[in-house]
C-alpha cells in the first residue's frame, strides 16, 4: 500500500503534467490522491512547498549509481546519461512549456533543494575521481558547481539548438564539455 505522502506526490505529478504548476491546486491534488486537503497540509505547509518536494523527488530519482572512481569516461557517460534522462522528463517539459518563469527562478535567482543535492553528489564523485588521479586537481565543490552549470544549461537549452545538435550530437558535445572540464590528463 502506498503511504499518503507518496500518493500526494504522485497525484501532484499527474496534476502538474496535466495542468501546469500555476493551475494545480491543493484541492485537485488531494482529490486525485484520495485524501483530504488537511492530510496534504499535514505533510506540507502549502502547495508551493509540496511542488518543490515533487520536483526534488523526481530529479533525485534519476541520480545514477556510483561508478568506479578511476574511470573518467564512465563518470562522464553516466553524467551525460543522467542529463539526458532529466532532459526527457515529462515534468521538466511541462515546466519549460507552461511555467518558464519558475524554471528561470532556479537558473537566474537561486538554487533549489534538488540542485544542492545534485551538487553535493557531483562533488563527492569528483573528489573520488581526483583521488584516483583521473579528474584534475582543484576544489571539488567548485568543479561540481561548474559541472552542474554545464549540464543544467545543456538540459534546459537543448530545445533551442536542435537545428545544430541532433540527439547524438547533443550527447557527444555535452560529453566533450564535461570531459574537458574534468580531465586531469588534458585529453580532449
Q: Language-model features: where?
A:
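Amphipathic alpha-helical packing segments from all-alpha helical-bundle domains
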Residues: 63, 104-132, 141-145
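Hydrophobic/aromatic-rich alpha-helical bundle segments in the mid-to-C-terminal region
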Residues: 94-95, 101, 131-177, 188
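Hydrophobic alpha-helical connector segments
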Residues: 53, 64-92, 144-147, 171
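Generic hydrophobic, amphipathic alpha-helix propensity
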Residues: 1-12, 29, 54-58, 62, ...
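Short amphipathic alpha-helical elements of helix-turn-helix/winged-helix folds
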Residues: 11-15, 85, 150
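Amphipathic alpha-helical segments used for helix-helix packing
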Residues: 87-109
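Helix-turn-helix
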Residues: 7, 11, 15-49, 53
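Tryptophan-centric aromatic hotspots in well-structured domains and transmembrane helices
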Residues: 43-44, 106, 178
